[in-house]
Amino acid sequence: MAKLGVNIDHVATIRQARGGVEPDPVAAAAIAEFAGADGITVHLREDRRHIQDRDLRLLRQTVKTKLNLEMAATDEMVGIALSVKPDMCTLVPERRQELTTEGGLDVRVGMQALADAIGRLQDGGIVVSLFIDPDADQVKASSKVGADYIEIHTGTFAEAREWKKEQAELERIENAIKLGTKLGLGINAGHGLNYTNVRKVAALGGIEEFNIGHSIISRAVFTGLDRAVRDMVDLVKYA
Protein backbone atom coordinates (compact mmCIF):
# COMPACT_ATOMS: atom_id res chain seq x y z
CA MET A 1 0.00 0.00 0.00
CA ALA A 2 1.52 3.31 -1.09
CA LYS A 3 1.98 6.25 1.26
CA LEU A 4 1.11 9.91 0.78
CA GLY A 5 3.50 12.76 1.47
CA VAL A 6 1.72 16.13 1.40
CA ASN A 7 3.73 19.03 0.00
CA ILE A 8 2.71 22.22 1.82
CA ASP A 9 4.81 24.70 -0.19
CA HIS A 10 1.77 26.45 -1.60
CA VAL A 11 0.36 27.21 1.81
CA ALA A 12 3.53 29.27 2.23
CA THR A 13 3.09 30.69 -1.29
CA ILE A 14 -0.25 32.19 -0.26
CA ARG A 15 1.29 33.59 2.92
CA GLN A 16 4.23 35.14 1.09
CA ALA A 17 1.89 36.79 -1.45
CA ARG A 18 0.94 39.27 1.28
CA GLY A 19 4.10 39.11 3.34
CA GLY A 20 2.13 38.22 6.44
CA VAL A 21 1.97 35.32 8.87
CA GLU A 22 -1.01 33.35 7.56
CA PRO A 23 -1.84 30.79 6.43
CA ASP A 24 0.75 28.98 8.52
CA PRO A 25 2.37 25.95 6.82
CA VAL A 26 3.17 24.47 10.24
CA ALA A 27 -0.54 24.40 11.09
CA ALA A 28 -1.24 22.95 7.63
CA ALA A 29 1.21 20.12 8.31
CA ALA A 30 -0.58 19.23 11.54
CA ILE A 31 -3.96 19.13 9.78
CA ALA A 32 -2.53 17.00 6.96
CA GLU A 33 -1.08 14.49 9.42
CA PHE A 34 -4.36 14.31 11.34
CA ALA A 35 -6.14 13.63 8.03
CA GLY A 36 -3.91 10.64 7.28
CA ALA A 37 -0.81 11.95 5.53
CA ASP A 38 2.21 9.69 5.99
CA GLY A 39 4.67 12.53 5.66
CA ILE A 40 5.18 16.23 5.03
CA THR A 41 7.27 17.58 2.16
CA VAL A 42 8.67 21.11 1.81
CA HIS A 43 11.06 22.66 -0.69
CA LEU A 44 13.44 25.21 0.80
CA ARG A 45 14.45 27.04 -2.35
CA GLU A 46 17.58 29.14 -2.59
CA ASP A 47 15.43 32.23 -3.30
CA ARG A 48 13.11 31.44 -0.33
CA ARG A 49 10.05 32.19 -2.45
CA HIS A 50 7.69 30.20 -0.22
CA ILE A 51 9.03 28.03 2.61
CA GLN A 52 11.35 29.94 4.96
CA ASP A 53 14.14 28.68 7.20
CA ARG A 54 11.98 29.29 10.26
CA ASP A 55 9.20 27.12 8.78
CA LEU A 56 11.62 24.25 8.30
CA ARG A 57 12.92 24.42 11.86
CA LEU A 58 9.42 24.58 13.32
CA LEU A 59 8.30 21.67 11.14
CA ARG A 60 11.21 19.57 12.40
CA GLN A 61 9.93 20.18 15.93
CA THR A 62 6.27 19.46 15.16
CA VAL A 63 5.98 16.89 12.36
CA LYS A 64 5.11 13.51 13.86
CA THR A 65 5.30 11.38 10.71
CA LYS A 66 8.18 11.99 8.27
CA LEU A 67 9.74 15.27 7.16
CA ASN A 68 11.04 15.28 3.59
CA LEU A 69 13.13 18.30 2.57
CA GLU A 70 13.39 19.04 -1.14
CA MET A 71 16.53 21.04 -1.88
CA ALA A 72 19.27 21.82 -4.36
CA ALA A 73 22.56 20.00 -3.82
CA THR A 74 24.45 23.13 -2.72
CA ASP A 75 26.82 23.56 0.21
CA GLU A 76 24.35 25.98 1.85
CA MET A 77 21.44 23.56 1.64
CA VAL A 78 23.47 20.55 2.75
CA GLY A 79 24.58 22.55 5.77
CA ILE A 80 21.00 23.50 6.62
CA ALA A 81 19.86 19.89 6.23
CA LEU A 82 22.61 18.63 8.52
CA SER A 83 21.55 21.19 11.11
CA VAL A 84 17.79 20.55 10.91
CA LYS A 85 17.98 16.76 10.33
CA PRO A 86 14.90 16.00 8.22
CA ASP A 87 14.13 12.31 7.84
CA MET A 88 14.75 12.48 4.09
CA CYS A 89 16.32 14.92 1.67
CA THR A 90 15.17 14.86 -1.94
CA LEU A 91 17.71 16.54 -4.19
CA VAL A 92 16.09 18.48 -7.02
CA PRO A 93 17.26 20.75 -9.85
CA GLU A 94 16.55 24.41 -9.30
CA ARG A 95 16.40 27.50 -11.53
CA ARG A 96 15.37 30.90 -10.18
CA GLN A 97 13.17 31.75 -13.17
CA GLU A 98 11.05 28.58 -13.02
CA LEU A 99 7.56 28.62 -11.51
CA THR A 100 8.03 25.10 -10.18
CA THR A 101 10.55 22.31 -10.63
CA GLU A 102 10.40 21.64 -14.36
CA GLY A 103 12.14 18.29 -14.68
CA GLY A 104 14.39 15.78 -13.03
CA LEU A 105 18.04 16.05 -12.06
CA ASP A 106 20.57 15.11 -14.70
CA VAL A 107 22.50 12.86 -12.35
CA ARG A 108 25.13 12.11 -14.99
CA VAL A 109 26.37 15.72 -14.86
CA GLY A 110 28.68 16.37 -11.92
CA MET A 111 28.35 12.88 -10.47
CA GLN A 112 31.25 13.31 -8.04
CA ALA A 113 29.85 16.52 -6.54
CA LEU A 114 26.45 14.88 -6.20
CA ALA A 115 27.96 11.78 -4.62
CA ASP A 116 29.82 13.99 -2.13
CA ALA A 117 26.60 15.80 -1.14
CA ILE A 118 24.77 12.48 -0.78
CA GLY A 119 27.57 11.08 1.37
CA ARG A 120 27.56 14.09 3.69
CA LEU A 121 23.80 13.83 4.19
CA GLN A 122 23.92 10.08 4.78
CA ASP A 123 26.78 10.49 7.27
CA GLY A 124 24.40 12.82 9.12
CA GLY A 125 21.78 10.08 9.33
CA ILE A 126 19.57 11.45 6.55
CA VAL A 127 18.02 9.25 3.85
CA VAL A 128 18.67 10.69 0.38
CA SER A 129 16.40 10.60 -2.67
CA LEU A 130 17.05 11.99 -6.15
CA PHE A 131 14.25 13.53 -8.20
CA ILE A 132 14.76 12.16 -11.71
CA ASP A 133 12.95 11.65 -14.98
CA PRO A 134 11.83 8.06 -15.70
CA ASP A 135 14.93 7.30 -17.74
CA ALA A 136 17.07 4.17 -17.43
CA ASP A 137 20.37 6.07 -17.56
CA GLN A 138 19.23 8.39 -14.76
CA VAL A 139 18.11 5.46 -12.61
CA LYS A 140 21.47 3.72 -13.08
CA ALA A 141 23.37 6.92 -12.34
CA SER A 142 21.32 7.43 -9.17
CA SER A 143 22.40 4.02 -7.96
CA LYS A 144 26.05 4.72 -8.83
CA VAL A 145 26.19 7.96 -6.80
CA GLY A 146 24.80 6.18 -3.74
CA ALA A 147 21.22 7.43 -3.46
CA ASP A 148 18.86 5.51 -1.19
CA TYR A 149 15.74 6.43 -3.16
CA ILE A 150 14.64 7.92 -6.43
CA GLU A 151 11.56 10.06 -6.85
CA ILE A 152 10.22 9.59 -10.36
CA HIS A 153 9.17 12.83 -12.06
CA THR A 154 5.59 12.27 -13.26
CA GLY A 155 5.11 15.72 -14.79
CA THR A 156 5.36 14.65 -18.43
CA PHE A 157 2.73 11.97 -17.81
CA ALA A 158 0.48 14.46 -16.02
CA GLU A 159 0.72 16.96 -18.88
CA ALA A 160 -0.03 14.40 -21.62
CA ARG A 161 -3.20 15.29 -23.50
CA GLU A 162 -3.30 12.32 -25.86
CA TRP A 163 -3.96 8.72 -24.79
CA LYS A 164 -0.94 7.41 -26.72
CA LYS A 165 1.41 9.88 -25.05
CA GLU A 166 -0.04 9.09 -21.63
CA GLN A 167 0.42 5.36 -22.12
CA ALA A 168 3.98 5.85 -23.34
CA GLU A 169 4.80 7.85 -20.21
CA LEU A 170 3.17 5.26 -17.96
CA GLU A 171 5.37 2.62 -19.60
CA ARG A 172 8.48 4.76 -18.97
CA ILE A 173 7.47 5.17 -15.33
CA GLU A 174 6.83 1.44 -14.93
CA ASN A 175 10.20 0.58 -16.47
CA ALA A 176 11.94 3.04 -14.13
CA ILE A 177 10.18 1.46 -11.14
CA LYS A 178 11.30 -2.02 -12.17
CA LEU A 179 14.90 -0.99 -12.82
CA GLY A 180 15.16 1.05 -9.62
CA THR A 181 13.78 -1.83 -7.58
CA LYS A 182 16.22 -4.24 -9.23
CA LEU A 183 19.09 -1.92 -8.28
CA GLY A 184 17.93 -1.78 -4.66
CA LEU A 185 16.57 1.77 -4.72
CA GLY A 186 13.43 2.83 -2.89
CA ILE A 187 10.85 4.34 -5.24
CA ASN A 188 8.81 7.51 -4.73
CA ALA A 189 6.92 9.54 -7.33
CA GLY A 190 5.46 12.98 -7.78
CA HIS A 191 4.86 16.17 -9.77
CA GLY A 192 1.65 17.14 -11.51
CA LEU A 193 -0.39 14.35 -9.94
CA ASN A 194 -4.00 15.11 -9.06
CA TYR A 195 -7.30 13.51 -8.13
CA THR A 196 -7.94 12.46 -11.72
CA ASN A 197 -4.64 10.89 -12.73
CA VAL A 198 -2.94 9.57 -9.60
CA ARG A 199 -4.69 6.19 -9.65
CA LYS A 200 -3.19 5.37 -13.04
CA VAL A 201 0.31 5.68 -11.60
CA ALA A 202 -0.55 4.06 -8.27
CA ALA A 203 -1.98 1.06 -10.13
CA LEU A 204 1.48 0.30 -11.55
CA GLY A 205 2.60 -0.83 -8.10
CA GLY A 206 6.10 -0.62 -6.70
CA ILE A 207 5.89 3.01 -5.55
CA GLU A 208 6.44 3.51 -1.84
CA GLU A 209 5.29 7.11 -1.52
CA PHE A 210 3.61 9.79 -3.61
CA ASN A 211 4.53 13.42 -2.92
CA ILE A 212 1.62 15.64 -3.92
CA GLY A 213 1.01 19.29 -3.14
CA HIS A 214 -0.55 21.69 -5.62
CA SER A 215 -3.70 19.69 -6.36
CA ILE A 216 -4.34 19.07 -2.65
CA ILE A 217 -3.96 22.74 -1.72
CA SER A 218 -6.11 23.72 -4.71
CA ARG A 219 -8.93 21.42 -3.59
CA ALA A 220 -8.53 22.58 0.00
CA VAL A 221 -9.61 26.08 -1.06
CA PHE A 222 -13.09 24.63 -1.68
CA THR A 223 -13.33 21.61 0.63
CA GLY A 224 -10.95 22.39 3.48
CA LEU A 225 -7.52 20.83 3.91
CA ASP A 226 -8.66 17.89 6.04
CA ARG A 227 -11.12 16.69 3.41
CA ALA A 228 -8.70 17.31 0.55
CA VAL A 229 -6.01 15.18 2.21
CA ARG A 230 -8.42 12.39 3.12
CA ASP A 231 -9.67 12.21 -0.47
CA MET A 232 -6.12 11.89 -1.81
CA VAL A 233 -5.20 9.29 0.81
CA ASP A 234 -8.09 7.15 -0.42
CA LEU A 235 -6.92 7.41 -4.04
CA VAL A 236 -3.27 6.63 -3.29
CA LYS A 237 -3.80 3.79 -0.83
CA TYR A 238 -6.70 2.03 -2.49
CA ALA A 239 -5.87 2.38 -6.20
Curated annotation (Swiss-Prot):
CDD domains: PNPsynthase (cd00003). InterPro entries: Aldolase_TIM, PyrdxlP_synth_PdxJ, Pyridoxine-5'_phos_synth. The keyword Phosphoprotein does not apply. 3-amino-2-oxopropyl phosphate binds at N7, R18, G192, G213, H214. Its main location: cytoplasm. Coiled coil: none annotated. Keywords: Cytoplasm, Pyridoxine biosynthesis, Transferase. Its EC number is 2.6.99.2. GO terms for molecular function: pyridoxine 5'-phosphate synthase activity. GO terms for cellular component: cytosol. It is an enzyme of class 2 (transferase). It is found in: Cytoplasm. GO terms for biological process: pyridoxine biosynthetic process. Pathway: Cofactor biosynthesis; pyridoxine 5'-phosphate biosynthesis; pyridoxine 5'-phosphate from D-erythrose 4-phosphate: step 5/5. It comes from the Bacteria. The record marks E151 as: Transition state stabilizer. It catalyses: 3-amino-2-oxopropyl phosphate + 1-deoxy-D-xylulose 5-phosphate = pyridoxine 5'-phosphate + phosphate + 2 H2O + H(+). 1-deoxy-D-xylulose 5-phosphate binds at D9, H10, R45, H50, T100. The active site is at H43 (proton acceptor), E70 (proton acceptor), H191 (proton donor). Catalyzes the complicated ring closure reaction between the two acyclic compounds 1-deoxy-D-xylulose-5-phosphate (DXP) and 3-amino-2-oxopropyl phosphate (1-amino-acetone-3-phosphate or AAP) to form pyridoxine 5'-phosphate (PNP) and inorganic phosphate. Belongs to the PNP synthase family. Homooctamer; tetramer of dimers. This is Pyridoxine 5'-phosphate synthase. It comes from Geobacter sulfurreducens (strain ATCC 51573 / DSM 12127 / PCA).
